[in-house]
Amino acid sequence: MDFESFFKNELDGLHQEGRYRVFADLARHRGSFPKATRYTADGAQEVTVWCSNDYLGMGQCPIVTEAMKNAIDECGAGAGGTRNISGTNHYHVLLERELADLHGKESALLFTSGYVSNWAALGTLCSKIPGVIVFSDAGNHASMIEGIRHSKCERVIFKHNSVADLEAKLAAADPRAPKIIAFESVYSMDGDIAPIREFCDLADKYGAMTYLDEVHAVGMYGPRGGGIAEREGLMHRLTVIEGTLGKAFGVMGGYITGSAALCDFIRSFASGFIFTTALPPALAAGALASIRHLKESQVERFAHQERVRRLRSLLDQRGIPHMVNPSHIVPVIVGDAAKCKWISDLLLDNFGIYVQPINYPTVPKKTERLRITPTPMHSDADIDHLVSALHSLWSRCALARAVA
């Protein structure tokens, strides 16, 4: 087989469909977020970033960066091993305690990313529990899907956020089989929120475990930043709450929280935890500082919500089509892969606005979009400039002014 030709042909297909991903070469500057410098073959350009998952700008917060610098001075750079073989630093232990407290659980377990935490935890639960059936929301993240698929357990996909469809599928399943209901709180592409209470009611009725991914909600919602489940007073009803340290907390890593026995079970059987080097102590120290701060401070969350409201209001005034949802994610619908990429390129090249186009397979075809994520650091002028640029490009492209 001519492997090189195969690789190139596959890539050519992505180019032709407008789905080839181009990474923006950015240098973020401490203290000036969301501004950054973009590097191209033509030189450097100052841009405003509108698609960061550092939702609250905590990755630039002096509380976090100072904690990380101090940890490097104290501990050095790397963890030095797996968690089992000399790699457990005291910062890991403190961070796991803080995460367990955040979600009202007995225990927590750190992973190297949110992807790995989902893949390893779900893969282990679904492969080790005899005869388990996992009921997975159709909108679940790739990390959850891959973990479930890797386990080779029986899986049932229910319609996205549909309480009725989930109940129908639970009722049709073997009543003797152990069951797991796996879903997210805030879905990253549409920004919609799961009916957590109703799913917990079904879990109680049918004797199922619940597995909730809160990666786009931790730090953002609830009086202490514990996510949607904390805001709704439902943390105690969930078996596993999974989250990330790389979005609102501004650092890197993933985790699960649950009972002491469950976390110890994952710790002892999950290959994605056992056979990898632990997070550097500085990352754990930064995440610890970020979580402690956001447990006490509402300033960042309130400012963030105000920025989201202002952006949505101005988009409405200009007739720019965005999906209405109850979260902080603002999807502006284009509906065509090539046009979505073209608009993103024009925003970057002509207006200094960086918004990454979101195309298939991340979202279904004909729903291509710009996924905009305001932060507390975006000024009124930043928002005005973005909306004005979108208005200009929508007119040039003769795009629809409403979400179908």
Swiss-Prot record:
Record's keyword terms, sorted: Acyltransferase, Heme biosynthesis, Pyridoxal phosphate, Transferase
Family annotation (InterPro entries): 4pyrrol_synth_NH2levulA_synth, Aminotrans_II_pyridoxalP_BS, Aminotransferase_I/II_large, AON_synthase_class-II, PyrdxlP-dep_Trfase, PyrdxlP-dep_Trfase_major, PyrdxlP-dep_Trfase_small
One GO biological process term: protoporphyrinogen IX biosynthetic process
Pathway: Porphyrin-containing compound metabolism; protoporphyrin-IX biosynthesis; 5-aminolevulinate from glycine: step 1/1
Active site annotation, chain numbering: 247
Cofactor(s) listed in the protein's UniProt record: pyridoxal 5'-phosphate
PROSITE patterns to which the protein is assigned, alphabetical: AA_TRANSFER_CLASS_2
SUPFAM superfamilies: PLP-dependent transferases
Modified residues (N6-(pyridoxal phosphate)lysine): 247
Protein residues bound to substrate: 21, 136, 362
Its EC number(s): 2.3.1.37
Domain of life: Bacteria
Catalytic activity, as annotated: succinyl-CoA + glycine + H(+) = 5-aminolevulinate + CO2 + CoA
Pfam families from the UniProt entry: Aminotran_1_2
Top-level class of the enzyme under EC nomenclature: transferase
Ligand binding (pyridoxal 5'-phosphate): 188, 216, 244, 276-277
Molecular function as annotated in GO: 5-aminolevulinate synthase activity; pyridoxal phosphate binding
CDD domains, sorted: KBL_like (cd06454)
Similarity section: Belongs to the class-II pyridoxal-phosphate-dependent aminotransferase family.
Subunit and partners: Homodimer.
Protein's name according to its UniProt entry: 5-aminolevulinate synthase
Organism expressing this protein natively: Rhizobium meliloti (strain 1021) (Ensifer meliloti)
